[in-house]
Amino acid sequence: MSVALQELGGGGNMVEYKRATLRDEDAPETPVEGGASPDAVEAGFRKRTSRLLGLHTQLELVLAGVSLLLAALLLGCLVALGVQYHRDPSHSTCLTEACIRVAGKILESLDRGVSPCEDFYQFSCGGWIRRNPLPDGRSRWNTFNSLWDQNQAILKHLLENTTFNSSSEAERKTQRFYLSCLQVERIEELGAQPLRDLIDKIGGWNVTGPWDQDNFMEVLKAVAGTYRATPFFTVYVSADSKSSNSNIIQVDQSGLFLPSRDYYLNRTANEKVLTAYLDYMEELGMLLGGQPTSTREQMRQVLELEIQLANITVPQDQRRDEEKIYHKMSIAELQALAPSMDWLEFLSFLLSPLELGDSEPVVVYGTDYLQQVSELINRTEPSVLNNYLIWNLVQKTTSSLDHRFESAQEKLLETLYGTKKSCTPRWQTCISNTDDALGFALGSLFVKATFDRQSKEIAEGMISEIRAAFEEALGHLVWMDEKTRQAAKEKADAIYDMIGFPDFILEPKELDDVYDGYEVSEDSFFQNMLNLYNFSAKVMADQLRKPPSRDQWSMTPQTVNAYYLPTKNEIVFPAGILQAPFYTCNHPKALNFGGIGVVMGHELTHAFDDQGREYDKEGNLRPWWQNESLAAFRNHTACIEEQYSQYQVNGEKLNGRQTLGENIADNGGLKAAYNAYKAWLRKHGEEQQLPAVGLTNHQLFFVGFAQVWCSVRTPESSHEGLVTDPHSPARFRVLGTLSNSRDFLRHFGCPVGSPMNSGQLCEVW
């Protein structure tokens, strides 16, 4: 399990946390009725000037004289201010180019028409929201998206360089993969044939033609093993939560195509989505050779099977206590639990050439689910099982086929997210695909082209300061007993941080070894993807008999994100996020602590959220809290859960339980970063203020934090986030966190009873 800062997009093994152009930023605001735009003022001035030069009336000459006098007085004031500034050794205002630029960006993002004590998110982001309408093809737009677009543009330039010549075979594979994705003419020429051939190789599909009726296990092994789809369940190799120095086979629930079980079960509210999904299933089936009438009926049966899976799928908010859902057993015991398939045969194929026996240990997350899946398989018609298994393969591979498949998907995405994927340039899609396939080789190119090594040293220093601030606050918690407090301090001390990138990516031999065995051709994008699935299966098998590597990264260097991994007790900050607006070396420290500092505090606090707190300093899942402190912790977190459950988006309430861990991390991260900033000021003295913004540096810290989360989103995407995302929506990551901050309320003078100060603060760390 990994915890990431912000969801950036769908899919993938990581919880993804998951951005505006210069043109959008420079676009003038639409003037309100009765107001004047900058253009209107400029036009009026020009008209008056032409009349002045043409008529020279006495009144106009007098006015001109007065204007010149006022201009002279203003110039005199500016000169006086300049003299005073140079005589002032403290130089309390920062007038460097960097300070002036960032002050301008902050000012254009603000909405001065809103009181910070009424709605701090609107105060901080109202201007940004006006200037940043959703770009075509996007269901949401924010700082993370903007920065990822910048990173993608850099990678595009590097990969399309005609003089590309690398000593690393892995880097050459990266360019070949990217170019194969760009070969649209070749992809169109092949059409659906590559997938048709693959389906025939596996044994056929009842939707499109003859199929082998007695090959359930063979099809399951091919679909879930060779091609890494996840029908019914997902199998992976990862660190054992209760013995984190060893890897183990793990099995968990899976098998739904739509983002959440809610889309299947709340059929009235999601009728449009379910209809669009069935239309999509039918269209893909026909593109692969199915007949209209029979295809729709067979795909309707697959959809009904997915609805039954949704019924037994455990909601994410009920899976937050890993102690309760962790079940270690042998393959023999797994066989007894879910006897509808041969688990030893399946896992032996999946992890070939390793030899497995009935006594091989497995961790199962959700025994009730697997038991019910087994019963569901037993009572389902073989033809429906075949259709469902091949459908899982189809949906995994169609993004590598011609435009007809993309057009079919676009209709579903528009219903699901309110956006059209076709608006996304092909090169951006190909950069994302390359990042998924050869992310660390791509990261090598990115780091060598962009990363300032000094950033790594500065980031390490900031982490130390934030860790110290967190531990100091730990010492003042009245609800925690001394034994638990000491253990918590030891865990905080033991948190391992990784910054920028893993060292191996800059060593060509080591980088090549990582991708050794992955064959990449410039001629066949579809085959490159199949080779990737097969290669990833082999990599997974290779990990089982090896101990987890402390220095193994779960995120590529160019990613705009960060994460905490409880089984390693480590926090990771890729190079992709160590940039403006999160961090810039020549910006005020208030902004850096409010940006990347809060990110660091957020990830550190994950070690002590409702899930991370179950792991000890060695990364093992075990009880290490005293009962009194645990009860007090739960009381404090209940306040957070209740608070966030009251927030609404488009009339739909947040799930305070589902978002609890991230909300704890947001609140704790802000507090740790602000305390670290105060400690920095005590050591270095007050820093210069930005010109024109009218904010103290303490206020600037909170504005900088809030503006990281400026965001726009379609209603459909907002709904999807509410039912799937462990993070609260951006607006409430700001409002919820700051309304619990005594420091924020003090520096902005928000009285009790104002919208930002209810008088009841929820505080855990």
UniProtKB/Swiss-Prot annotation:
Q: Which GO terms describe its cellular component?
A: cytoplasmic vesicle membrane; Golgi membrane; plasma membrane; transport vesicle membrane
Q: Which residues cross the membrane?
A: 61-81
A single Pfam family, by name? Peptidase_M13_N
Q: Which residues are glycosylated?
A: 161, 165, 206, 266, 311, 378, 534, 627, 635
Tissue expression from the record = Isoform ECE2-1 and isoform ECE2-2 are expressed in brain and adrenal gland.
Quote the InterPro entries the UniProt record gives. MetalloPept_cat_dom_sf (IPR024079), Peptidase_M13 (IPR000718), Peptidase_M13_C (IPR018497), Peptidase_M13_dom_2 (IPR042089), Peptidase_M13_N (IPR008753)
Cofactor note as given: Binds 1 zinc ion per subunit.
In its UniProt record, which GO terms are filed under biological process? brain development; cardioblast differentiation; heart development; peptide hormone processing; protein processing
Instruction: Give the Cytoplasmic membrane side ranges.
Output: 1-60
Q: Which family does it belong to?
A: Belongs to the peptidase M13 family.
Q: What is this protein called?
A: Endothelin-converting enzyme 2
